[in-house]
């Protein structure tokens, strides 16, 4: 297959994955973000990169957004929101993050393929995501892509869609958000 044909197939998979995401769950996440004093994002590996990109856009919107594990991350306070992206919902470090957030009376939102996972069971809000686990032999969702690629890509697109929803709710545009962009580059 040609590279451009692979691109087309990946885009087709991403297009189809949108139908598996609940607008109601997405709206609940947006509402939690709007009502939270601080928002923390977490993920491991490529899912962690997606979490960082989401925190960055939230910061561009003026939200008090942080990335779990960074050296400048402040303490979580009661009622703060922790958004965890984990395909399997069984990543050990993220299970610990969810448990710690709950012990501090934070609100945990889990974006996962597996709502019945250890992280899902601790979550106050679950956003069910399409995709295949890294070990695709146990997955019911078929993809041509390796390991968790479809989940990770869908996660990024979902985060960007939530940003658009928040922009709409707050009446923001890209130009306004750019005033929060780094300027020491």
UniProtKB/Swiss-Prot annotation:
Induction: By formaldehyde, under the control of HxlR. Not induced by methanol, formate, or methylamine.
GO molecular function annotations of the record: 6-phospho-3-hexuloisomerase activity; carbohydrate derivative binding
Keywords (A to Z) from UniProt: Carbohydrate metabolism, Detoxification, Isomerase
Gene3D superfamilies: Glucose-6-phosphate isomerase like protein, domain 1
PROSITE patterns according to UniProt: SIS (PS51464)
Domain SIS positions: 29-172
Gene Ontology BP annotations: carbohydrate derivative metabolic process; formaldehyde assimilation via ribulose monophosphate cycle; response to toxic substance
Reaction(s) this enzyme catalyzes, per UniProt: D-arabino-hex-3-ulose 6-phosphate = beta-D-fructose 6-phosphate
Pathway(s): One-carbon metabolism; formaldehyde assimilation via RuMP pathway; D-fructose 6-phosphate from D-ribulose 5-phosphate and formaldehyde: step 2/2
Top-tier EC class: isomerase
Entry annotation: catalytic residues: 152 (proton acceptor)
Binding, substrate: 47, 86-91
EC nos: 5.3.1.27
InterPro entries: PHI/rmpB, SIS_dom, SIS_dom_sf
Cleaved signal peptide residues: none
Domain of life: Bacteria
Function text: Catalyzes the isomerization between 3-hexulose 6-phosphate and fructose 6-phosphate. Together with HxlA, may act as a formaldehyde detoxification system.
Recorded family membership: Belongs to the SIS family. PHI subfamily.
NCBIfam families, sorted: RuMP_HxlB
PANTHER family reported for this sequence: 3-HEXULOSE-6-PHOSPHATE ISOMERASE
Subunit relationships: Homotetramer.
Protein name: 3-hexulose-6-phosphate isomerase
Gene behind this protein: hxlB
């Amino acid at each position: 297959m040609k590279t451009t044909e692979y691109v087309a197939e990946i885009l087709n998979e991403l297009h189809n994955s949108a139908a598996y995401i609940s607008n109601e769950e997405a709206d609940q996440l947006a509402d939690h973000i709007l009502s939270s004093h601080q928002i923390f994002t977490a993920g491991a590996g490529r899912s962690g990169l997606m979490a960082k990109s989401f925190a960055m856009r939230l910061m561009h919107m003026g939200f008090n957004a942080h990335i779990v594990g960074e050296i400048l991350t402040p303490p979580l306070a009661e009622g703060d929101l922790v958004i965890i992206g984990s395909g399997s919902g069984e990543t050990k470090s993220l299970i610990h993050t969810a448990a710690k957030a709950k012990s501090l009376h934070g609100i945990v939102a889990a974006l996962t393929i597996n709502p019945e996972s250890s992280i899902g069971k601790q979550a106050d809000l679950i956003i069910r995501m399409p995709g295949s686990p890294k070990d695709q032999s146990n997955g019911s969702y078929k993809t041509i892509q390796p390991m968790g690629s479809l989940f990770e890509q869908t996660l990024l697109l979902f985060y960007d869609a939530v940003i658009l929803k928040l922009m709409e709710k707050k009446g923001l545009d890209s130009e306004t958000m750019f005033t929060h962009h780094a300027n020491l580059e």
